[in-house]
Amino acid sequence: METFQIILLALIQGLTEFLPISSSAHLILPSQLLGWKDQGFSFDVAVNTGSLLAVVIYFRHDLWTMAKAWVLSLVKGEQSNESKLAWWIILATIPAVIFGFAAKDFIATHLRNTTVIASTTIIFGLLLWWADRMSRSELTVYQTGWRKALLIGFAQALAIIPGTSRSGATMTAALMLGLSREAAAKFSFLMSVPVGLGAAILVTKDLVESPEAIDYQALGIGMLVSFLAAYACIYYFLKYISRMGMTPFVIYRLILGSVLFALILW
């Protein structure tokens, strides 16, 4: 791949992974508009790893505190806000793992197309708008509870459908369940860690077994750009989301979905 192509695709991955606007909808645009071939399995692994490293490093203190508290809850039975949050994150991960294994082949075969992505981009954008407008509660992440965590986990499982947006679906569910905008975003970002780690392990195994030639320079550039873009995205999103709300992302999703439908008809 050309350097411009590497940087653009890595930027798209890094910026859209944590914004509620669907990364799959954006990754399909370069191929549609510029006629680019698929970037290859190894490049997907690299840019996803970059995004995962960004969220892990950004929330390193939270994750370390949660991990220690979780271990203490197992060893000594000590419960704290951090240990409960860790358990809720684990619980919220289960539906995506089950649904992902069960429906992976069906989704890849039948739902990974522009029509589905355009439709879900618009539909789930409208759901995000409704949830943001109707939500009046200000619960923190430590007030989530296991029932809400499980429901948010089902939303994450639904986001396996291309165009839905994992962050968009989980934030929508969290807002509907009474979490504040900032809490909904933080819970969504923390949820991405176990899912991302699991996916990274699986795809790395597939990559090792793949006969695909590996361009390590391209992978390094892609991972770095994706990491920087994702880190900046998380920082500014959490900084401004309480005041800004979800409306700008909803409008953007409606425009993006319309553009994708226009490309279908073109």
UniProtKB/Swiss-Prot annotation:
A GO molecular-function descriptor: undecaprenyl-diphosphatase activity
Q: Which residues cross the membrane?
A: 1-21, 39-59, 87-107, 111-131, 149-169, 183-203, 218-238, 246-266
Instruction: Supply the EC number(s).
Output: 3.6.1.27
Q: Which InterPro entries match?
A: UppP (IPR003824)
Q: Write down the chemical reaction(s) this protein catalyses.
A: di-trans,octa-cis-undecaprenyl diphosphate + H2O = di-trans,octa-cis-undecaprenyl phosphate + phosphate + H(+)
For this record, an example GO cellular component is: plasma membrane
Q: Predominant location of this chain?
A: membrane
The free-text function statement in the UniProt record for this protein reads: Catalyzes the dephosphorylation of undecaprenyl diphosphate (UPP). Confers resistance to bacitracin.
Q: Which HAMAP family does UniProt cross-reference here?
A: Undec_diphosphatase
Supply the PANTHER family for this chain.
Answer: UNDECAPRENYL-DIPHOSPHATASE (PTHR30622:SF4)
Other facts noted in the record for this chain: Bacitracin is thought to be involved in the inhibition of peptidoglycan synthesis by sequestering undecaprenyl diphosphate, thereby reducing the pool of lipid carrier available.
Q: What is this protein called?
A: Undecaprenyl-diphosphatase
**Record organism:** Shewanella denitrificans (strain OS217 / ATCC BAA-1090 / DSM 15013)
Lineage of the organism: Bacteria, Pseudomonadati, Pseudomonadota, Gammaproteobacteria, Alteromonadales
The encoding gene: uppP
